[in-house]
Amino acid sequence: MSFLSRQQPPPTRRAAAACSLRQKLIFSPGSDCEEEEEEEEEGSGHSTGEDSAFQEPDSPLPSARSPAEAEAERRRRSPGAEPSSPGELEEDLLLRGGGGGAQAAGGGAEGDSWEEEGFGSSSPVKSPTTAYFLGSSFSPVRCGGPGDASPRGCGVPRAMDDPCSPQPDYPSTPPHKTFRKLRLFDTPHTPKSLLSKARVIDSSSVKLRGSSLFMDTEKSGKREFDTRQTPQVNINPFTPDPVMLHSSGQCRGRKRAYFNDSSEDMEASDYEFEDETRPAKRITITESNMKSRYTTEFHELEKIGSGEFGSVFKCVKRLDGCIYAIKRSKKPLAGSVDEQNALREVYAHAVLGQHPHVVRYFSAWAEDDHMLIQNEYCNGGSLADAVSENYRVMSYFTEAELKDLLLQVGRGLRYIHSMSLVHMDIKPSNIFISRTSIPNAVSEEGDEDDWISNKVMFKIGDLGHVTRISSPQVEEGDSRFLANEVLQENYSHLPKADIFALALTVVCAAGAEPLPRNGDQWHEIRQGRLPRIPQVLSQELTELLKVMIHPDPERRPSAMVLVKHSVLLSASRKSAEQLRIELNAEKFKNSLLQKELKKAQMAAKVAAEERALLTDRMATRSTTQSNRTSRLIGKKMNRSVSLTIY
């Protein structure tokens, strides 16, 4: 659509002051406005070319007229209708000029430069009439008919009305295809960004993912969630990959919630996304309003132990009738340093699961700010109790029992280290004894102890100092069993610190004097010297214990090497796995011998065949020579000579 804009000469007097900047729009042939003009002509049936607000470019342009001439022209078109005041005349001119009537053609002196959207300047020209139009509260009034004497009667029917209607309707808005194309406002609509639709996030604005795809959420009443109401959970730091629990498993699974059109908002989405991905707050050990689970589910039989952390009670569970060991903290742990140790023990138990040489964990809960842990009950008590009893009666663990202790606890450490964890508090009071006559089943590693070992099972317990090998948070244990490198805060060989403590534990079980907590003797032990043992041990076992407390942690054997040491695997104590290994080795040797035997047999057979073939060849050669001799003719014989003479 093309435009021709002609600036009229500045008018004079009051009309010039009111409409000094308006321009007339003249459309070129073939424009869309000609269709409007045709529709207006069809609707009115009597409008002429001079009644149209749009003129052909070849038609003569009206010259500037005075206000008196404009008033006379309006009186001529609407007889009997006189404006009461110049202000009313201006209002009438504005309405009729915007409506496309003849007054628009005759009011060239009042025109602004009204431009079509997308052409010319990007902002309209503000004129006094435009300001008057915006400031007033009137609306265009429909005419009662062509003969209406009101000054607001426009006399121009709407193009969309039926041309056959005797009383055609008149437009209540300027008869333009798009009202906004007239640009009668001072400024265009400000583009709204996504941020302009921001609203305060509440639980009612966040819908479940995908709820708006298949049904109306308002009608369906689909349940909603609030990220602030999400139940809190603890994050176990001893799982194989604790970081992926929030970045992989949750960030991928939970995405931003969908918002409806009225509340769609990037800031709200980002706020919710950050709230979702933020690590969950840790649940602390607080007072519970629930009824005591300890008294409800368990019946306390006796107190079987006490330590720095708390007391251990022997209890029977009312539901299954089995005996369990319930550890209860002595004092409230909420907000204390011991709270982290209690949680660390629960985390470690949950990750390690079930192993024949680790005390089994069942459950844990908090009551009145106290932590309670339900563990496996070991009927033999702790190794410390056994050592104390032996010391009282002046008896000791035999060498066979010491080897069994070293082997079983070594297997437990091998399992803990395989989970990338370290115990960091191996000592006699943390090793428990379970006496049973039931043969032990094959463990996860395929190890099965013999009947003697099954009568006494040594299990590692008290996991309050467990930490990860890769990212250690070391809480130093008993100084009597603490390796020197840990005291120096060298955490590069933490599994070897458990080996060091295990060697001293075996020394205590062998009958040695109580270990020092500090002093010269303490440093002598860290230099690789064993404490004095009141019984005579084999040289092999003594050397093994010395290697286990070597000052250089790299020289100490790992738990994997320890459980396969030849000293611990005697003929009467070899595991089924070791016996199978030896059996397979013997089978392999037998197979090699069988192959060698087959090769020797094949070689002998080939040699016999070669000898037989050689004999046949010799016999064939002699027979051939004899045949040749018998067929020879003329040897030692007179040959007949015939001669013919012609």
Swiss-Prot record:
One of its GO terms (molecular function) is magnesium ion binding. One of its GO terms (cellular component) is nucleus. Its main location: nucleus. The keyword Magnesium applies. GO terms for biological process: cell division; establishment of cell polarity; microtubule cytoskeleton organization; mitotic cell cycle; negative regulation of G2/M transition of mitotic cell cycle; neuron projection morphogenesis. Synthesis is increased during S and G2 phases, presumably by an increase in transcription; activity is decreased by phosphorylation during M phase. Protein levels fall in M phase as a result of decreased synthesis combined with degradation. Activity seems to be negatively regulated by phosphorylation upon entry into mitosis, although N-terminal phosphorylation might also regulate the protein stability via protection from proteolysis or might regulate the subcellular location. Its EC number is 2.7.10.2. Residues 165-174 have a biased composition (Pro residues). InterPro entries: CC_SR_Kinase, Kinase-like_dom_sf, Prot_kinase_dom, Protein_kinase_ATP_BS, Ser/Thr_kinase_AS, Wee1-like_protein_kinase. Pfam families: Pkinase. Mg(2+) 2 binds at N341, G464. The active site is at D425. The modification Phosphothreonine is found at T187, T190, T239. Residues 27-174 are annotated as: Disordered. Keywords: ATP-binding, Cell cycle, Cell division, Kinase, Magnesium, Metal-binding, Mitosis, Nucleotide-binding, Nucleus, Phosphoprotein, Transferase, Tyrosine-protein kinase, Ubl conjugation. Mg(2+) 1 binds at N430, D462. It catalyses: L-tyrosyl-[protein] + ATP = O-phospho-L-tyrosyl-[protein] + ADP + H(+). The modification Phosphoserine is found at S52, S78, S85, S123, S127, S137, S139, S150, S165, S269, S306, S311, S642. Residues 298-568 form the Protein kinase domain. Residues 32-42 have a biased composition (Acidic residues). Acts as a negative regulator of entry into mitosis (G2 to M transition) by protecting the nucleus from cytoplasmically activated cyclin B1-complexed CDK1 before the onset of mitosis by mediating phosphorylation of CDK1 on 'Tyr-15'. Specifically phosphorylates and inactivates cyclin B1-complexed CDK1 reaching a maximum during G2 phase and a minimum as cells enter M phase. Phosphorylation of cyclin B1-CDK1 occurs exclusively on 'Tyr-15' and phosphorylation of monomeric CDK1 does not occur. Its activity increases during S and G2 phases and decreases at M phase when it is hyperphosphorylated. This is Wee1-like protein kinase. It comes from Rattus norvegicus (Rat).
